[in-house]
Amino acid sequence: MPTINQLVRKGRVSKTKKSDSPALNKGYNSFKKRMTDQNAPQKRGVCTRVGTLTPKKPNSALRKYARVRLSNNMEVTAYIPGIGHNLQEHSVVLIRGGRVKDLPGVRYHIVRGALDTAGVEGRKQGRSKYGTKRPKK
């Protein structure tokens, strides 16, 4: 326990908060060929690999994922939400932050219904999260 005098001289140092989605906090200047500090809510990228992963211990499934090379030249693993998808290699996608708890190393989600990613077919509820248009009556 520090004394009052020690606290007056040094003070408390607050811990720096680490980002949950670091790839969204970096930009890339292609003229200078160096990284910049530009935060973004989403980023565009190109799929380099599309496949399935198996989740951690208590769960069992084949979760769809895509390896994405972002516009800032970083490569990340992103989860493809919803049932069925039309993504393949060289598809242009939009990613947002948000991890998948039972897939280690997956810190991003692909936004359905944006760029080359189609919305989920036949979805009636929670459509906005899956990029599905309103059904015709």
Curated annotation (Swiss-Prot):
Output the InterPro entries linked to this UniProt entry: NA-bd_OB-fold, Ribosomal_uS12, Ribosomal_uS12_bac
- Report the function annotation for this chain: With S4 and S5 plays an important role in translational accuracy. Interacts with and stabilizes bases of the 16S rRNA that are involved in tRNA selection in the A site and with the mRNA backbone. Located at the interface of the 30S and 50S subunits, it traverses the body of the 30S subunit contacting proteins on the other side and probably holding the rRNA structure together. The combined cluster of proteins S8, S12 and S17 appears to hold together the shoulder and platform of the 30S subunit.
Which gene is this protein's source?
rpsL
Does the record's keyword annotation contain RNA-binding? yes
Q: Which HAMAP family match?
A: Ribosomal_uS12_B
Annotated spans, Disordered: 1-43
Tell me its family.
Answer: Belongs to the universal ribosomal protein uS12 family.
UniProt protein name? Small ribosomal subunit protein uS12
Q: Which UniProt keywords apply?
A: Ribonucleoprotein, Ribosomal protein, RNA-binding, rRNA-binding, tRNA-binding
GO CC, any one term: small ribosomal subunit
User: Which Gene Ontology BP annotations are present?
Assistant: translation
Molecular function per GO:
rRNA binding; structural constituent of ribosome; tRNA binding
- UniProt subunit comment: Part of the 30S ribosomal subunit. Contacts proteins S8 and S17. May interact with IF1 in the 30S initiation complex.
**tRNA-binding among the record's keywords?**
yes
The record's PROSITE patterns line, in alphabetical order, gives: RIBOSOMAL_S12
